[in-house]
Structures are given as structure tokens and as C-alpha cells.
Amino acid sequence: ELAECVGLSHGSIAIGASETALNLFLLDKLKEFHNTYPGIRLKIYNHSTPQAVEAVRRGTVDFAVVSTPVKADAPLHMTMLHPYQEILIGGTEFGHLAGKQTTFEEIMQYPLICLGKETVTFQFYRQLFASYGLDFEPDTETATADQILPLVRSGLGLAFIPKPMAKDAIDRGEVSEIRLCEKIPSRNICLIYDSKHPFKEAATQLKKMIAANSFASVE
């Protein structure tokens, strides 16, 4: 018990996290952990999902919390944590689209904003559009998820964004949800870790806290 107390009184944990995972899920867990174990230092690395998975594989982070779709081969272990739904939004310049249902083919005539080609979000939408025989070619690619909403508000184009991240801007009337005829598949926040990686007590405790109430586990 003494060793366990010492392990939770000081030390550090390295976490790879995508912005979406951080904003939609991880922040609340980190706050809870920090309040319980204030002596543990947290190192949060801003990674795309592929970067985070590679960091886990190399052992430069203890684990990662990222968005699907994600490929994690053994010995990496993936636990699904939290589902979320994305919606299409546009600024006031595209308000005429908000009052009707629109198809993927129809929105192709408008400028689109998305994360860069190296991200799983870009690949997710490229494959989704391809399933309808369409090429997904955004006019603007961003380096981070947090850049998308300001660009939409400024009228640079339409974008797909997690619904919780768009809620405040929608409520303020800065952007509008554009209803689609096609269904956007839901995505998930997931925990990735190396099952062969030895965890210190602090990392083990945070991992348990993050995975509490998770709904699926994949080896």
C-alpha cells in the first residue's frame, strides 16, 4: 500500500491525444484525475490519430486517446470510450442551405473545409463520399480541428464537425446545421495502449479512470 501511495503522489504520465478526443472526452477525465492526484504531472501531446498510434507503438507516450477510424494491430489494444456524431455546418453566407435537406452531390458545388490529407478525418470523408461515387476534394485543409469552426464562421466554406463542438456557435446563430439526405456514420473516441508496455501506478490509475464505463474492447 505504501508503494502504491508513493506511486500516486508524484511522477508523470505522457498521453497522445487528438484535439477532438481532448475536447469531447479527455478534458473531464484529466480534471478528475488531477483533482484526485495533484502530484502527478501530465504531459499531453497534440497528435493526429496516426501520429498518436505510432507514439504508442514507439513507447514515447503511455497511451493515446484518439478518434476512429483507427488501425491498431497487436500488441496494441483498443478500447472504445465514447461515441459522437458529426454534422455539416455553414456560416451565415450559406444560410439558404439550412432550411432544406441537401445531398453530398449538391454540397460539392460549395467550398469545403476539412483537416489535412494525413488525418483519419480526411480519409473517413474521402471513403464516405467515394461510397456515393463522389470525389472528396476540400478547398481548404487545416492543420488542427480547432481551426475549422473559425473558418466556417468567416464564410470560407462548409465543414463536418462533431455536433457538441458546434453547439454554442449554432445557438448564437453564427453557423447553421445543414441537414443531409445521406447519413454520416457515427465515430468513436477510443483508448489505444500497448498491452506489453509496463505501466507505472499513476498511468495505470488514469487508464482505469479513462476506460471506466467503456462499451467495447478490441484486441
Language-model regions, residue ranges each:
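Short beta-strand->loop
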Residues: 77-87, 172-186
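Secondary-structure junction motif
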Residues: 111-132, 199-203, 207, 216-217
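Short helix-loop hinge/linker segments at domain boundaries
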Residues: 1-14, 34-35, 73-78, 98, ...
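Flexible hinge/capping segments at coil-to-helix
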Residues: 7, 75-116
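Central regulatory/effector-binding core of bacterial HTH transcription factors
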Residues: 10-72, 142
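Ligand-binding cleft/hinge of the Venus flytrap
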Residues: 30-37, 105, 122-135
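A late-sequence structural motif
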Residues: 25, 176-218
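Hydrophobic hinge/microswitch elements
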Residues: 48-53, 57-61, 67, 124-178
